[in-house]
Amino acid sequence: MEEAELVKGRLQAITDKRKIQEEISQKRLKIEEEKLKHQHLKKKALREKWLLDGIGSGKEHDEMKKQNQQDQHQTQVLEQSILRLEKEIQDLEKAELQISANEEVILKKLKSIERTTEDIIRSVKVEKEEIPEESIEDIYANIPDLPSSYIPSRLRKERNEESDDEQNRKALYAMEIKVEKDLKTGESVVLSSIPLPSDDFKSTGIKVYEDRQKSVYAVSSNQNTAYNGTDGLAPVEVEDLLRQASERNSKSPTEYHEPVYANPFCRPMTPQRERVISPGPNSQERMVMMKANGLDHHESESVHGMTDGLSERRSNGLAHTSPTRPTPQPRSKVQQVEEMVHTQQKRMPSPWEESSIRQNEYEVSPRTELSPSRASPGKSGPQCSSPICQEEADVRYNIVHSLPPDVDDTEPVTMIFMGYQQADENEEEKKLLTGYDGVIHAELVVIDDEAEDDEGQAEKPSYHPVAPCSQVYQPAKPTPLPRKRSEVSPHENTNHKSPHKNSISLKEQEERLGSPARHSPLGVPGAGDGTEDPSLTALRIRMAKLGKKVI
């Protein structure tokens, strides 16, 4: 009751204080109005007094004098009213201060008497404890004709919960998570997470979070119970810590190991250059070895005129097969090559063809030289009539693409380009090409030291083992020179152009180099007195210094 009276006294003080404040504001407005009137009357009285000084005696003078006296009287009344209002305002302000002081006293008393929320909750709990609740058993006991064996479902559920409480709350698994919390930002970082056996887990520490599924206990870094002021964790924080711990467990360091294959035949062996002594058994044995290694790519070898023992292996990932596979011939130092040479019409080389010719001047075949003197039209091998077969033979036995098997790729080789010559139809050419039957036979001569001809030399791979299947490594393919439509020979297959159709044959090159009437191609001056070409002389001098002999 005392608290209620104090609350009422405080409310009354607040109301009186509010009324006094409104009254003070009204009186101040009235004072402002009185001051305005007082100033107006003062100005009017001064003006009338100034006018009376200039007017003589008479009726008008008397009236103005009387009006001036009335104005002065009103001015005095206004001054008194203003003073009275100011005094009343001062009294009201004093009363307001007194009411405020009384309000503060009442507020202090209320704070000393008023109960906190905890006290109110505690008192409510005590009141509930004082009032005994009727149990369910007592309620059902008052029901007549109820069998004694009947147990209400609610009571049965409560009994089951009490009996199975320990079993339901037994930990299925436990995990120790080390967490570092930044006191500035409040962020928690999981340092490590270690799973623990649920049997060895003991509820040590302060419980900071619990629901029907999981419980979280806070333990200090020295495995002791954390201090009692540990704050609880929100469900969001618990979920975040569990997510970080699971992510940390899922991360495993990268392990590097050797490649593992399902069977030992899934990776091809590095292809080696073969050193064929007898033609028959070696080729068959090598083919069986490739199949045993489990190669998925079809290997095709075209052996044509194998007097040199050279074989080109072509393979790709598209199951390419060779049209023919002739029987290899015994090995020797000379490889006979067939080329079909077609007579071209008269034309000048275009600028791009000239640049391509200059580029081809520096194409090198390691440790190989051409000897025009050994070309004989009588040594012709088997010929193929189809254009596709001719192109394959042209590419297969081209001197730029052929590579002897016993050449060491690491040693440098010097070659001198002899030049190109356009084939023109004239009388001189007809004289030079007497007995020409459409086929020129060239010989590939390998200049090598006899002492280095060691058959037991270590074998080296002919090309990269995975180059045909690689998408990164693709060897450059020779591009054919551009030709006009009118300059294409009708005997050539235009769908399969070979980049070496325009190259001059060795026999024709020899005859033109030895001819005094022909001019040297590419601007090299030839001797006009019948002597041999200076480039050929330079070649002979170079070979003589090396201890070789040009045949």
Swiss-Prot record:
Tissue and organ expression note: Expressed in the brain and the spinal cord. Expressed in the anterior olfactory nucleus, the olfactory tubercle, the nucleus supraopticus, the nucleus of the lateral olfactory tract, the piriform cortex, the cortico-amygdaloid transition zone, the septofimbrial nucleus and the indusium griseum (at protein level).
- Kindly give the InterPro entries that the UniProt entry links to this protein: Paralemmin
Q: Which UniProt keywords apply?
A: Acetylation, Cell projection, Coiled coil, Cytoplasm, Isopeptide bond, Phosphoprotein, Synapse, Ubl conjugation
**Where is it mainly found?**
cytoplasm
* Biased composition annotated in UniProt, kind: Basic and acidic residues: 247-258, 484-495
Name one process (GO BP) from the record: regulation of cell shape
Q: Which domain of life is it from?
A: Eukaryota
Keyword flag Zinc: no
Sites bearing Phosphothreonine, chain numbering: 270
User: Which compartment or compartments is the protein found in?
Assistant: Cytoplasm; Cell projection, Dendrite; Cell projection, Dendritic spine
> Where does this protein have coiled-coil stretches?
12-106
For the cross-link Glycyl lysine isopeptide (Lys-Gly) (interchain with G-Cter in SUMO1), list the residue numbers: 178
Q: Where is this region: Disordered?
A: 247-267, 298-387, 452-536
Any one cellular-component term (Gene Ontology): membrane
Protein name, entry field: Palmdelphin
